[in-house]
Amino acid sequence: MLEADHPSTKNNDIGLILGPAFIALAFHLAANGFGGYGIFRDEFYYIACSKRLAAGFVDQPPLSMFLLAASRNLFGVSQIGLRVLPAVAHALAVLLAGLIARKLGGRRTAVTLACLAVLTAPIIIGHTNIFQMNAFSHLIWALAAYLLVLIAERSRPALWLLLGAVMGLGLLNKLDFLWFGAGLAASLLLTDMRKHLATQWPYAAAATALLVFSPFIIWNASHGFAHIEFIRNATAGKYSGLTRLDFLAGQALLLNPVNMAIWLPGLYFLFFDRDGRRFRVLGIIYVIAFVILLANGHSKAEYLGPAYIMLFAAGGVAWERWAARGRRIWAVAGLAGASVLTSLLILPFAVPVLPVETFIKYSAALGVKPATAENLRLSVLPQFFADMFGWEGLAQDVSAVYRSLPAEERPTAVVFARNYGEAGALEYYAGKFPLPGVISTHNSYWFWGYPKKGVGTVIVLRGNAEDHRKSCAEVALAAVHSCRYCMPYENDLPIYVCRGLRVSLHDVWNEERSFD
């Protein structure tokens, strides 16, 4: 596959792009159809959000929730059904990497190397193996980068308007797309792309992006800028332990250390190669995003992940040209092989492809300790995997407590969950086990509120009896939920039955609001 190129082959290479894209799709469907550890904590919450569609949510813009609502109707909410669209997003990102490489001047070798890197990069394959905003960030960044390459090649008004729409969708998916916009703005000032400022089209693109994004702005303004509060609390709380060193190390580890040999030459190509310089807008976008995240001091390394697709494409071109000058195609083949092999070694840490006990042994053999980006105590699994365990058992235990209530109490009973994972999981399994309505003061659940009347018995998760007696006349420990591989704070979780509320739920809502 990695062979010397000939101009006549350029139009016959679509299979080199479609092949890896199909492999990406097939891998995710197989991994989730025949394996996996279960539905991830956040996915339960996202399902709940998708059933309460709005122009915004406390912890995310609305685009991915609308996609999930459509996905639920098409594919259901099983493990594999939830993850079809992220799998498609990965496949399309691979496809766009190949197309970008071709537009940058690459041929078969460049396309192959770019597609392989995006196919196997641990952070990309991990993000797209579950339903989350990050899965679509990779696709949207890649699509916006491709449109910029087309604009640099031949500017057309329609391309600018399409770019504006894509940028608006990027912001509606996740606010980190602001960094892409900041890099583009810098490029319009610092490069020969400034010639476009003499036309109306960059401004039309910005206006289009703002128009597409405006529903979330309006939602925030009408909800006390809840998303800003969420970002502030998360940065000061659960992400406060992250350091700049963590961020820098993650750029190597999460993308696969071998892949540095692909994306670093790609960055060089965009800034210093005679043919690559006209596309240096892509390099500037990466650098601006990198600087913003590094300056923040508490950024998760994965935040920069979507920016590497365009660097992998450029790196493929750089390697192809270097190899062609000295008939060094063997070196490119060796790099591709090393990249794939190393990614396969890292893969079990990104996607649950091994039985859990096998993974624990594999991790120990490599000397890798469980990790988290948040200030939390860990189990024998990294947080990403641990948060896939224990949810059905929790629903069973709460259901048993609910069924133990006298028949006359059940119609007015509710469950008070302390975080969105617990609340979302209980709602998810309500179709399988008898469960009452669920309320919570965490993130968007706070806005979704509580029954305004008719609340009697409250089943409360967490806390201690002494504190609960301040709010309830009668408190009884009804059960303790245990789970083997879950996060420690979800293990040995007390489940209380509280009767005779001493305070109104209105007061509880004002005191217990938690946006983080």
Cite the ranges covered by each PLM segment.
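Transmembrane-helix signature of polytopic, membrane-embedded enzymes
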Residues: 4, 15-18, 22, 97-120, ...
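Membrane-interface transmembrane helices that cradle and orient dolichyl/undecaprenyl
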Residues: 8-9, 102, 144-160, 194, ...
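Short acidic/glycine- and proline-prone juxtamembrane loop motifs at membrane-interface regions
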Residues: 123, 129-137
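Transmembrane-lumen/periplasm boundary regions of multi-pass, lipid-linked membrane glycan transferases
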Residues: 169, 178-279, 297, 347-352
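Signature aromatic-anchored transmembrane alpha helix within multi-pass, membrane-resident enzymes
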Residues: 320-362
